[in-house]
Structure formats: C-alpha cells, structure tokens
A protein has these predicted regions:
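Repeated scaffold domains used in trafficking and secretory/extracellular systems
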Residues: 51-56, 101-116, 177-183, 222-236, ...
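Beta-strand-rich domains and repeat architectures in extracellular enzymes and scaffolds
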Residues: 44-78
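Short, conserved, GDST-rich strand-edge loop motifs in beta-rich repeat architectures
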Residues: 70-74, 126-152, 362-386, 433-440
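Residue-level detector of Asp-centered blade-edge/turn motifs that repeat once per structural unit
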Residues: 60-62, 119-121, 186-188, 238-241, ...
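Surface-exposed loop and turn segments in beta-propeller and other repeat-based domains
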Residues: 41-46, 93-109, 168-177, 215-227, ...
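Blade-level signature of beta-propeller repeat domains, shared across WD40, Kelch, NHL, RCC1
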Residues: 413-449
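Beta-propeller blade signature
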Residues: 80-86, 144-162, 313, 378-395, ...
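Loop/turn-rich, solvent-exposed surfaces of beta-rich toroidal or solenoidal domains
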Residues: 306, 311, 339-394
Length: 449
C-alpha cells in the first residue's frame, strides 16, 4: 500500500523504492497466476436496437438482475428488463421514455440510463440520460433533433417498484441536461446527480419533492476546449453524515456537505499521484486524475475507487482526508506489459460481491500471444482487448486475475461498462456480442473460486 500524500522532496525516491519492491514481491505472484479462460453465456432480450450501456445494472434483493439496454434511436427509448436466474427468464419491464411521462411527445427520447440502480424499500431508484449524439473534433455533444422533433427534455429521477411493477417519475434535470451520474442516500431520502454536458450537481429530496441545482462543478463541463472537464461518474455517499464525494479531472476530491447543503474541496489530500501517470485534464481523451468508479465500504468507513486507464485501486478515508494507492487491478497481461489499456471508456465495472468484502472488477486488457502483446482489430478498426475478471479480497489484500472471458464460439465480449454480482457469485454484465444483429445484451460469467 502506498500512502498518497508523501511530501514532494522524497516522493520520487519513495516511488522508485516501491516500484522496485513491487517488482520483487509481486513479480513471482504474477508469474504464478496462469491466464485462464472463462466461458460466458449470452442472452437475447429481444431488443434489436440495443446500444452500449454504462452502469445500468443491479443484483437486487429478490435475486433478480435488473438492467437497461440503451437505444440511439430518435423514435425509441432505452428499455428496462429483469432476469430471474431461478426461472432462467427475462422480463421486459418498460420503456424509459414512457416511464418519464414523455410518450407521444415526439422529442429526443430517454435513450439510456447511465447510472446503477439503488435499492431501497422494495424500489429501484435511478435516472435517465440522452443517447442522441454528434461527434466533431473528437468531442461528443448532444445532436440537434431532426425536423419535426423537439429537443431532449432532460433526464429524469425515477423509481421502479419491484412488487407492483410500476414506475414513479420524480423530477427532471434543468436546461435539457441528461443525468450522467447518480446515487441515493436511502437513510435521508435524497437522490443526487450530475448532469451532462454542463456538470450541474443536483439533489432531490423525496419527502419534500424539492429539486435543487447547486450549479456547475466542471468549468464548462464536457462542452468544449479549453475549459472542458470530464464529469465524474461515481458519487459514493458516507451514510454516517450524508456527505457525497466526487472528483474532477484535475484530481481534486469534492464533498457535498448534507449539514450545510454546500460543496467544498477536501483539503487534506487529492488524487494527483505519480502512480496514476501524467494526465492533461483538458484533452477529454481520458479521465485525468479523477476516479472512474467508486463505492462505499462500510466495514472501514472508506471509499474504494478505481482510476481510469491505470486501473489502480484507491482507498479514501473521508475523516482522515487520506488517499492510499493499494493495487493495480489491471489484468495480468496488462500488468506484465507495463502499459495502459487501449479502451478509454471502461473502468466502471467495479462492485462488491455477495460476501461483502470482495471487489469484482471487469477489465478489458491486453491480448498476449507467444509472450508478446498482440494488436488485433475489430470490424470497425478498433483495437480488440480481452475481458478479464479480477477479484480483490479487501481484508486479505489479495488480487486474483481469474482469466479472460470468451463465449463458447471463441468470440470476445466487448464494450463492457457494467457489472452485477448475483447471490451465487455469478457475474453479469452488458456487452457487445459479436455476430448478433443486436449489438449489446446481457452476459453471464460463471462463479469463480
């Protein structure tokens, strides 16, 4: 474990020492871990327009896997489903545009949910997002509606009652913004979100019905250079006091104070660590120094987070205001290569398992053949990578790469940005399924030891 706030004069000496120590101590362990193969099963939810999904999953208390399939289509919104492992049955639950009360509006639809569900009192709380984009100069922006259609109305805070099978529509984001990040403080009845593209921080109070916009936190958000800043995708909450934590590409840790209804910058530490590499937060091609995915770990009253591209696991103690760099969760082939991963938009697939202390992580890493990193291209020209299942036992500080994931025909799941771990330890994700007319659907990876 590397302490995050080492004084600057001795920092490089510490880094060199730790790297050397890591090579000595971890090298044999990595060599001992054979890169095995796991065989995954794909499902057919019956939605031919399905597109890439980010988060949008949960293994709920009723044993079912809930998920959203997105659609980049002007006439069709994202669709919500459940999979019952006991019955081996998929059920279509609803259309996100209809759930938002916008059926027949003839506007840009609620094309996706970009957030993980939060379960509370038999309901799944989540938010909707836009899936209607244009790309210019490598910059993604909301596309204008075609003739005869209205602009995107804005993302919604929603809930789904698992027993009644009904949706509730609470509030809509301002200025036609999507909701790209969300979490819920179930104890205090608060939903929080960050909007796209401007990066407004929203809070919605379930009891009063009040939606408050605390303003932009990311300069011009993901709107344009040179003031562009990538918006945080994960908002872990400290249940003890109701504080919400988030980061920016510059490496600052921000804290929403429930007691003051205000946002402040944590002064004791930050994520600008040598271990994470050197990043230009302006480019938008990566996620800078901010965490990509993060969750609250109650046994230690701490946040566990993954940094994008490097896949380093971080631990943040909110009261001590201390960041520790723990372990690189990248696959064994990626770690051996010493390189970052090719795919820029992953690193969201982090979740606690059913035992409450094991982290599960899906990472798209290097393809290695004959001991060397191989470059393979997909039909669209993108570099292919192997999807690996990684686990990290927190109390034991034990990293395990369980191997690359393939379908029975040898094809690779791709574009994985989601994860849910069932009660039996099976790992579910939403992935590109090569050879299918639909692009993305549910995938199951069998339990591992």
């Amino acid at each position: 474990m590397v302490r995050g706030n080492t004084p600057l004069p001795g920092r490089w000496g510490v880094v060199i020492f730790v790297l050397a120590l890591g090579a000595f101590c971890r090298g044999p362990a990595l060599r001992a871990q054979e890169v095995k193969h796991l065989t995954a099963r794909s499902f057919d939810s019956g939605f031919e327009l399905s597109n890439g999904t980010f988060n949008g999953m949960l293994a709920a208390s009723d044993g079912k896997i809930y998920y959203v399939l997105c659609a980049e289509n002007i006439d069709t919104g994202g669709q919500m489903y459940s999979y019952d492992p006991a019955a081996d049955k998929i059920t279509h639950l609803g259309d996100l545009t209809e759930a938002s009360g916008e059926k027949g509006l003839k506007a840009v639809p609620q094309g996706k949910s970009h957030v993980s569900f939060v379960e509370s009192n038999g309901k799944l709380y989540f938010a909707t997002h836009v899936d209607w984009y244009s790309v210019q100069n490598d910059l993604e922006s909301m596309a204008p509606p075609p003739p005869g259609y209205k602009p995107y109305p804005g993302g919604h805070f929603l809930a789904y009652d698992m027993a009644a099978g009904k949706f509730e529509n609470f509030a809509k984001a301002p200025e036609g913004q999507g909701i790209i990040s969300m979490n819920m403080d179930a104890q205090r009845g608060r939903m929080y979100g960050l909007t796209w593209p401007s990066g407004y921080f929203l809070r919605y109070d379930l009891k009063s019905g009040q939606l408050k916009n605390l303003g932009p936190l990311y300069r011009d958000g993901e709107g344009g250079h040179p003031t562009k800043r990538v918006i945080c995708r994960a908002l872990p909450i400290d249940p003890r006091e109701g504080s919400v934590y988030l980061t920016n590409a510059d490496g600052d840790i921000l804290r929403y104070r429930y007691d003051r209804d205000a946002i402040e910058t944590v002064q004791g530490d930050n994520l600008r660590k040598d271990y994470l590499g050197t990043w230009n937060p302006i480019t938008g091609q990566d996620f800078g120094y901010g965490w990509r995915q993060a969750l609250w770990y109650a046994p230690e009253n701490a946040v566990y987070a993954v940094h994008g591209r490097s896949s380093y696991l971080l631990r943040f103690d909110p009261r001590a205001e201390r960041v520790d760099v723990l372990e690189r969760l990248a696959s064994v082939p990626t770690r051996r290569s010493g390189m970052y991963d090719e795919f820029h938009y992953g690193y969201l697939s982090l979740s606690l398992g059913p035992d409450g202390h094991t982290l599960y992580y899906l990472e798209e890493g290097a393809i290695v053949q004959n001991g060397k990193r191989a470059v393979k291209r997909g039909p669209g020209g993108d570099q292919l990578e192997d999807l690996h299942l990684i686990t990290y036992d927190i109390p034991a500080a034990r990293y395990t790469d369980h191997g690359a994931v393939f379908f029975s025909n040898g094809a690779r799941p791709g574009l994985v940005n989601s994860i849910a771990v069932g009660k039996d330890g099976a790992v579910y994700c939403l992935a590109d399924i090569p050879g299918k007319q639909r692009r993305v659907d549910l995938v199951r990876i069998p339990p591992v030891e």
